[in-house]
Curated annotation (Swiss-Prot):
Composition skew (Low complexity), residue ranges: 1-14
Stretches assigned to the Cytoplasmic side: 1-517, 793-1220, 1516-1542
Gene source species: Candida glabrata (strain ATCC 2001 / BCRC 20586 / JCM 3761 / NBRC 0622 / NRRL Y-65 / CBS 138) (Yeast)
Post-translational modification: Phosphorylated by PKA. Dephosphorylated on glucose depletion and independently rephosphorylated during glucose exposure or under stress.
Protein name as annotated: Pleiotropic ABC efflux transporter of multiple drugs PDH1
Residues annotated for ATP binding in this entry: 921-928
Gene Ontology CC annotation, any one: plasma membrane
Disruption phenotype: Increases the susceptibility to rhodamine 6G, cycloheximide and chloramphenicol, and also increases rhodamine 6G accumulation. Suppresses the development of high-frequency azole resistance (HFAR) in a medium containing fluconazole. Impairs the blockage of the efflux of fluconazole by milbemycin A4 oxime when CDR1 is also deleted.
Single Gene Ontology BP annotation: xenobiotic detoxification by transmembrane export across the plasma membrane
Amino acid sequence: MNTPDDSSVSSVDSHQPYMGFDDNVEKRIRELARSLTQQSLTSSNRSVNKEAPADGSAPLDRVSTRASSIFSADFKGVNPVFSDEEEDDYDARLDPNSDEFSSKAWVQNMAKITTGDPEFYKPYSIGCCWKDLSASGESADVSYQSTFLNLPVKLLNAVWRKARPARESDTFRILKPMDGLLKPGELLVVLGRPGSGCTTLLKSISSTTHGFQISKDSVISYNGLTPNEIKKHYRGEVVYNAEADIHLPHLTVYQTLVTVARLKTPQNRVKGVTREDFANHVTDVAMATYGLSHTRDTKVGNDLVRGVSGGERKRVSIAEVWICGSKFQCWDNATRGLDSATALEFVRALKTQAHIAKNVATVAIYQCSQDAYNLFNKVSVLYEGYQIYFGDAQHAKVYFQKMGYFCPKRQTIPDFLTSITSPAERRINKEYLDKGIKVPQTPLDMVEYWHNSEEYKQLREEIDETLAHQSEDDKEEIKEAHIAKQSKRARPSSPYVVSYMMQVKYILIRNFWRIKNSASVTLFQVFGNSAMAFILGSMFYKIQKGSSADTFYFRGAAMFFAILFNAFSSLLEIFSLYEARPITEKHRTYSLYHPSADAFASVISEIPPKIVTAILFNIIFYFLVNFRRDAGRFFFYFLINVIAVFAMSHLFRCVGSLTKTLQEAMVPASMLLLALSMYTGFAIPRTKMLGWSKWIWYINPLAYLFESLMVNEFHDRRFPCNTYIPRGGAYNDVTGTERVCASVGARPGNDYVLGDDFLKESYDYENKHKWRGFGVGMAYVIFFFFVYLILCEFNEGAKQKGEMLVFPHSVVKRMKKEGKIRDKTKMHTDKNDIENNSESITSNATNEKNMLQDTYDENADSESITSGSRGGSPQVGLSKSEAIFHWQNLCYDVPIKTEVRRILNNVDGWVKPGTLTALMGASGAGKTTLLDCLAERTTMGVITGDVMVNGRPRDTSFSRSIGYCQQQDLHLKTATVRESLRFSAYLRQPSSVSIEEKNEYVEAVIKILEMETYADAVVGVPGEGLNVEQRKRLTIGVELAAKPKLLVFLDEPTSGLDSQTAWATCQLMKKLANHGQAILCTIHQPSAMLMQEFDRLLFLQKGGQTVYFGDLGKGCKTMIKYFEDHGAHKCPPDANPAEWMLEVVGAAPGSHANQDYHEVWRNSEQFKQVKQELEQMEKELSQKELDNDEDANKEFATSLWYQFQLVCVRLFQQYWRTPDYLWSKYILTIFNQLFIGFTFFKADHTLQGLQNQMLSIFMYTVIFNPLLQQYLPTFVQQRDLYEARERPSRTFSWKAFILAQIVVEVPWNIVAGTLAYCIYYYSVGFYANASQAHQLHERGALFWLFSIAFYVYVGSLGLFVISFNEVAETAAHIGSLMFTMALSFCGVMATPDAMPRFWIFMYRVSPLTYLIDALLSTGVANVDIRCSNTELVTFTPPQGLTCGQYMTPYLNVAGTGYLTDPSATDECHFCQFSYTNDFLATVSSKYYRRWRNYGIFICFIVFDYVAGIFLYWLARVPKTNGKIAKNGKTAKVNFIRRLIPF
């Protein structure tokens, strides 16, 4: 295992100045290294000396104190796993649970162990060289935004592109030919602007090329191994770590890391150590190394699940890769979200790995400090996909200076190198201009210069030499090392360390942890299904009290319910598949496990909850329904249903693994659900199926299982007959063949019906097929299981697309038209000017930066710099703040489990107009929490203290009077930049301001943020929309467009940006401050230059405790002086003050403060001055007159009606621009209704035809679940954006939000209902019934109204279940159970007369009761019935009587039925019904109630909407509780979210 450097091997010595390595120290270390033998591990420490930056930024005490002992220690290779303090060889530096633990010592000790027995441990290394490397991606076929109308055209174009011969325009070049060489032990930093190809380069050299292609001419070699060999055999040795932190949120940090450790534990580990002990030890070392030990039992979390902080989550990602022990690592912006000191320690860690373990690391860093840069051996500079330099990191500056560029004195080397790629940023040396020397400026010019340079020739020679000297021995060394690490049963050619079954074992443990940590979902499913068993079983309870032939239909219906409920209980598993897929993809690239092993383990881990659910449901249901009381029959019933559960589970998993998104999966899943349920054999017996569709029955596993269940229940049973034809009155004494049982399968003269006869005549089922169902079911279980494993193993994720802006189609047309005109008028335009115009970096900010770099010196006046900045900015009428915002004794407590934790501890401060205040601290110190508390954005916990505006408590308009730029760039992805800004301006600026003025202000914001080139671009998603920088600008722009009059909060505005964009962003903030705006900004990685742009600093340490609040001073001298006066070691002149300060207070990883600087602050004179200033503010400012303007004190700037209008317009626009949701809804509707319609095509007027029409209506409603599952994620996306950004800023009211959701969804559902009506109504043949009854128009119109109402009802119930739920999956569970209950009690499966009296109320409150009653009566009423031959009952009339004479009394009483031949004397053929209304009466359906039912159903829809609105208010709208402190002032505004416990 490799480990990073523990940057603080010893605590900071306050008596030693922070001066770095001086000449004497370097001399002593060199002498010490020479004195040791070659075998000593201190040979690697000579390279550590080279690691020391030339500017002396490494702390001296790390060398002169305990570090010196590490450098000189001759480790004996102590087994670190069983370190015991009682043992003589115990070394605290090797114990991860000790405060004295040193990761560097641990690595050196492990290196000593491995080098001591090379035959066992097989040490090896991997380098890489690439030659003429170029990459290309598929040109996106979506150059314009997709909408509901243009999506089909785009899809047809895409099909045409696939069908026609390939063209050069089908691909675009991401990387142009480039070269590089990395030897073992080297570090490479890749510098370039966003979009320059940094990520693609890292993916290319790490052989992670899914989504783009490497050209055939490219050469990539890893010690002689090709990329294909790496992918196939050594995937885990070459790793790419993406920027995003993707983890299973419900796992703890320990569980996440120990799983990786188990899967990467080598066979040739430390001798005498078990696999489990080694994995646990390595996990402890990783957590200690990266400062995660305190989060051991904390969930990793994500945006929805509370867990560790963002910085800690990033460290978990880093620890994962470290545990993997990869020899070649590629890190994509791995320092994002880390403070500057932690980022530096991360690079130092990589340096230690490189020197001691001979690892290779390539890092793309957007904001690279000089200290971090000094640790790299090589640098690659990319410019729009071209490589313009590769070579020695320290020589790069000289190279570009020779090219003709000037590096200002204060500019760091990485900033200088990145600035070369920005025409607005770079500066040409005046001497070159004066001499007329041409300086390369375009990418092509720079590439040409690079290819003609001596550095390039030398690089090519080294690459050629390396390729020439690569041999089979190098490959064999890697192969032997890889095999030595593999477990016993692992294939030697496999890239994985442990065997397949061990992978399954460890993932299984992980999955059980997941289930345990999120047990609420599983428990809800188990107990929810058990409750449904009680409900459904009791519904059939009265029916099954007897075992007469009258119960045949209901007994079959109960069995049908049983198998469907068991089979489709796994449908929602599709949700969880998409949650875990990104993690599986990541772990596949780390070679942790086969994706199929993860699938295998997921199936096994779901067995216990499935079995428990099946046991509870089936026991309850079986005995309540009163199925056969026979042990053998019960266990067979249970076995068949369990097979149904797993067969369908595996089938739905196959569907999920084939599709890329949940909405894509819902269409085939719903079609399968419909087909499987309709062709089970109950709704339509196989003998009655249409010829074209009968094949579906033969491939339907549920059909065979249902047959087995029915045979199991009916075989070898006699069912007494209670109902005869004829019966009653004089017929009571009739016996023999003169009457017949009114049941299918009855025989004249018998007073019973054999179950086998019933099955044969009704379904063509036979007892000999009983075990056939079991065999077929098991075959399907096994088949779908292996298909699922194969799909998971070989189905890759979605391909990436190159970064591109997307515009609406109308804008693209306009741009093309303008482009043709521009091409004609600007044919001779200088290309450099065009390039300058295309850049999005703020030129004003660049000029200010250059001026600052040139003019800064000890005597420079910071005010002159500021005035220069002010003079360079355009006057756009930005709002100016006049109020002072201040807070005192601010505390924030949150309940965590059984205790209350204090997050903020008596924080004081203020923000004045025209000042730029920085808020800093280590990860988890409470910076974002402080901003949330100040901005009234907390949703839980208790806030105490005073938060004032001009000495008075915040009023109701406070939230909309501030701007809050969140760290996450949250925007509506379908809107354009200009639309986003206007939406903010329209709703957050006062209504008294005209639309024209608001539009002008928006244009001014676009201009000051330099967003003109993409003002009409769609926000989109990363890769297809705005890039990181553009999103950050839009985030700031949205808040500026609101024209905040008090202050602006910015949370990590520079996170993820390159140094130039970070500088431009900082200058923008400075510009706003110069316009009188008050700004409070959190910042993680400020460079020395960025730091000095701030006026004041509020610094927090762990626990939310203040360490410093005050002026920074010129060059941060005021802040530095404060810490130095209070015991801190001296800050070197060239050090970054931010990094120095983090180390002083112990906020940097591994550093330790020499005292509690919070207590130092509380006892300082500066603290007293702050308190005095706050008291003075409170007294003086409170005397100012209040703003009596009515608009100033409103919670929202505009009226509710105006908000509602704008939100509706935006939401309708979003639906129109989200064609995948709408087309999924409509395609699902069309295919479902076509399937139902043609399955029951033109149903006739026989009894079976009537039953088919009734069951078709029943199936018509089954589309509910898929429609619901499509809608819920769409609503959640809207809600997340509103609750995260728009509600806290008081953009618009929750009432406008929820009402708009209702109003905009309804029209699309009306369209869906109309489509369903047109297809279903006419294909089933209801129109023929209406025509025969001479009611064609009325009944057709009414059926259409009901069809629309049903689709609207789906949306209303969806809103109801998601209104109080956080997660769509839970809401889908609740919605599915509610729908199942409504469908069960609607009167189709069990008539109200047959239900227990207790459940009659459910029949009456089920909305589907009224829907199906009305649809059925409207569809089939007032039509004559004509029975088929098989439906006629046959009996013999008494001697001497005709059939008519014999049946006349019966017909007069019954009022329904007819004889086919009343004059017959030998056999009477009788049909039980003569009129459809008589059939409707048996299911309690009445035609005259149709309009009443419509009104009641509409009331259900209204109720769902009203209840949904109420529950949303109750569960998710913050309630304000003003608490009064002892001094009588308002202490807090506490937000409480009352969550419904689901």
